């Protein structure tokens, strides 16, 4: 049996730490909106994140060879500029917990895009999960009482999830055509490309003047060192030492912990209707995760 198939306490601990790091990053992302524009922060986050990732790449002796440009740029635009940039923009007027949940609808978009572009058939359980998620989204959005600001935030958060899902399809095609591509190298180069793109966006789009408070520096340090370099290193370690089905639990745990952290630290009470929608989305995520696990077990040789 491979190491990834065994119960590894150290890897499970790494998964817990990883989940907490990525969950708490939503709190910093929300708090920093009071001092810096969404695109300025995303650009700086990508710049420092790329710097730290390339240092990690050098320390691990992986070399600096660029990954396939076309796919890497597409992932940078969709995953980092699209997912992170849109989520940060959504947080300007939206709550951290709500934005986290809507961004983490990504697995549903992956299922839909895989059916449309990769020819993967939707199973009955996936149809059911998508219906549950759609109803959950309806309850979270509460369109009967939305104003423009909350509607804008919700749509940006959903588009963040859509963009993230599209990046997963691009990544699948990349791995199909270049199976030996190194994940850490890919992450580093796409972060560099995203830093360049977001820097241009930040220069072109008018935003609030940056108020260089300690929160901004703490948020940048947290994003670059913990949420990027350490978290991705932990993710690689977790993937190597745990089954993919267990590693994918972070897809469920991060938005849930994000909601709990925002409730506890930011006083964001979702209310009965929105809370019910969040529960339904998490249930649907669990169903999609279970179906993925079954599909992987069938396809393994």
From Swiss-Prot:
Q: Where does the record locate the signal sequence feature?
A: none
Biological-process GO terms, alphabetical: sulfur amino acid transport
Any idea which GO molecular function terms this record carries?
sulfur amino acid transmembrane transporter activity
Q: Does the record bear Methyltransferase in its keywords?
A: no
Q: Name one Pfam family in it.
A: EamA
**Principal subcellular localisation of the protein:** membrane
Which stretches are transmembrane? 9-29, 39-59, 72-92, 99-119, 128-148, 151-171, 186-206, 219-239, 246-266, 269-289
Q: Which UniProt keywords apply?
A: Cell inner membrane, Cell membrane, Membrane, Repeat, Transmembrane, Transmembrane helix, Transport
GO terms for CC? membrane; plasma membrane
Cytoplasmic side residue ranges read 1-8, 60-71, 120-127, 172-185, 240-245, 290-301
EamA domain segment(s):
13-141, 152-289
Q: How does it sit in the membrane?
A: Multi-pass membrane protein
**Subcellular compartments:** Cell inner membrane
Topological domains on the Periplasmic side lie at: 30-38, 93-98, 149-150, 207-218, 267-268
The record's statement on gene disruption is:
Deletion increases the sensitivity to cystine.
Induction per UniProt is: Up-regulated by cystine.
Taxonomic superkingdom: Bacteria
What does the protein in this record do? Involved in response to cystine. Overexpression confers tolerance to excess cystine.
* Family recorded in the similarity comment: Belongs to the EamA transporter family.
- Name under which the protein is recorded: Probable cystine transporter YijE
* Gene from which the chain derives: yijE
